[in-house]
Curated annotation (Swiss-Prot):
Location in or out of the cell: Cytoplasm
Role, per record: Involved in targeting and insertion of nascent membrane proteins into the cytoplasmic membrane. Binds to the hydrophobic signal sequence of the ribosome-nascent chain (RNC) as it emerges from the ribosomes. The SRP-RNC complex is then targeted to the cytoplasmic membrane where it interacts with the SRP receptor FtsY.
Entry protein name: Signal recognition particle 54 kDa protein
GO process terms (BP): SRP-dependent cotranslational protein targeting to membrane
Taxon lineage: Archaea, Thermoproteota, Thermoprotei, Sulfolobales, Sulfolobaceae
Pfam families: SRP54, SRP54_N, SRP_SPB
UniProt keywords, alphabetically: Cytoplasm, GTP-binding, Hydrolase, Nucleotide-binding, Ribonucleoprotein, RNA-binding, Signal recognition particle
UniProt free text on domains: Composed of three domains: the N-terminal N domain, which is responsible for interactions with the ribosome, the central G domain, which binds GTP, and the C-terminal M domain, which binds the RNA and the signal sequence of the RNC.
Family membership: Belongs to the GTP-binding SRP family. SRP54 subfamily.
Length: 446
């Protein structure tokens, strides 16, 4: 899908034609690639017009060549077409968390329920499945097979036609057994064009089980037709997000993604294959980076972001020191990512004033430091937003879940929390000293 765009980037960056001619050729190539992927013609020409406007109005920064700057503009506008800077909230906002899956027949909804269960289980959550699709005879059996494969329990009532009752009883059972995340697979008996009936059924089950989140499953082969379904769903559900399946098996994936993004409905995951682990968190910028050719784009983006990251961290630490803001694990995560972008730890240490006077730090110690940073990032990736913003709630049970989800030991999670607490105490001490110095100078001035 959208391979033509990647080819156009290679041709543009490596070509020998003049810049102006190369730009015109690239714009024609990108229009052709998007239209063949079933993106609406109106959206395609709107995109290329925005690119042309920016080329006229903006000047390339000094550290980028003109061709690199052009690709950066294309990257920005394609990202906006597929959803912009929206980072999907993957981790549950609270525990327990109930997800209700809805979708028309043939979208791969039941398979997606299993993939979703596997995704969260790998992150350390205690997950269960409820099979409430009573209209497709093999749905429950399929879900049970998937549950057995990934070692996740499945609740169902063979032969029953009471979809609402099954959903209610299944959710109640698993919540009483202290499961952290319950996924309900609902009926998908309606086809494309029957969105109203689908949404009515969704409402009935929703009122009985009161899920925290409703996810609509859409087949990528719908292309731009996905707009109507996504729009109705987005208007009907204020806790809704979308999974687009079968992205690997159709040329219309770009059309489906752009159509859904145009409705404002958040796309949370995309299905990229039949295997149980082939469900990806959808990040528009990462997706666009991939279709543009990751290697070519990364160097350009890193040049643009290096200074932004550094300035952002400086600003945050200034706010913490003045008491305007508090330090969180989310801030620590950003700091580690920013440090790693600057290059190997050994080179970074050489840049710190005074380090060269202390002699060389043993290479094995530097390597341990780099490994620890990577493991800490993995640990923080397995935390909920609540935990990242308020680490004080992380008790022994949460530590065990986080360790399991990140493939680390509980002791490593505890070490990270203790390090964070030490940093907080140090900052408080520095803040007090700063106030004492200001007070002293005030007295001297008086």
């Amino acid at each position: 899908m959208l391979d033509g765009i990647r080819d156009a980037v290679r041709k543009f960056l490596g070509g020998n034609t003049s810049y102006e001619v190369a730009v015109e050729e690239f714009i024609k190539d990108i229009q052709k690639a998007l239209i063949s992927s079933d993106v609406q013609v109106k959206l395609v020409f709107s995109l290329t017009n925005k690119i042309k406007e920016r080329l006229k109005k903006e000047t390339p920064p000094s550290n980028l060549e003109r061709r690199e700057w052009f690709i950066k503009i294309v990257y920005d506008e394609l990202s906006a077409l597929f959803g912009g800077d929206k980072e999907p909230e993957v981790n549950p906002k609270s525990i327990p968390w109930v997800i209700m899956l809805v979708g028309v027949q043939g979208t791969g909804k039941t398979t997606t329920a299993g993939k979703l269960a596997y995704f969260y289980k790998k992150r350390g959550y205690k997950v269960a499945l409820v099979g409430a699709d009573v209209y497709r005879p093999a749905a429950l059996e399929q879900l049970q097979q998937i549950g057995k494969q990934i070692n996740v329990p499945v609740y169902g009532e063979p032969g029953s036609q009471d979809a609402v009752g099954i959903a209610k009883r299944g959710v109640e059972k698993f919540l009483s057994e202290r499961y952290e995340l319950v996924i309900v697979d609902t009926a998908g008996r309606h086809g494309y064009g029957e969105e109203v009936k689908l949404l009515e059924e969704m409402k009935d089950i929703y009122e009985k089980i009161k899920p925290n989140e409703v996810i609509l499953v859409i087949d990528a082969s719908l292309g731009q037709k996905a707009y109507d379904l996504a729009k109705r769903f987005h208007e009907a559900s204020n806790v809704g997000s979308i999974i687009i399946t079968k992205m690997d098996g159709t040329a219309k994936g770009g059309g489906a993604l752009s159509a859904v993004a145009a409705t404002g409905a958040p796309i949370k995951f995309i299905g990229v294959g039949e295997k149980i682990d082939e469900l990806e968190v959808f990040n528009p910028r990462r997706f666009v980076a991939r279709i543009l050719g990751m290697g070519d784009l990364e160097a350009i983006i890193e040049k643009m972001k290096a200074m932004e990251d550094y300035e952002g961290i400086q600003k945050k630490m200034g706010e913490v020191m003045t008491g305007k803001s508090k330090l969180t694990l989310r801030d620590m995560y950003k700091q580690i990512v920013a440090v790693r972008k600057m290059g190997p730890l050994s080179k970074i240490l050489q840049l710190i004033p005074g380090m060269n006077m202390m002699g060389d730090i043993p290479e094995d110690q530097v390597k341990v430091g780099e490994q620890k940073m990577q493991r800490w990032l993995s640990i923080m990736n397995s935390m909920t937003y609540q935990e990242l913003d308020n680490p004080s709630i992380i008790d022994k049970q949460r530590m065990r879940r986080i360790a399991m989800g990140s493939g680390t030991e509980v002791e490593e999670v505890r070490e990270l929390i203790e390090h964070f607490n030490t940093v907080q105490r140090t900052l408080k001490m520095l803040k007090r000293r700063k106030k004492d110095v200001e007070k002293l100078f005030g007295q001297m001035g008086g």
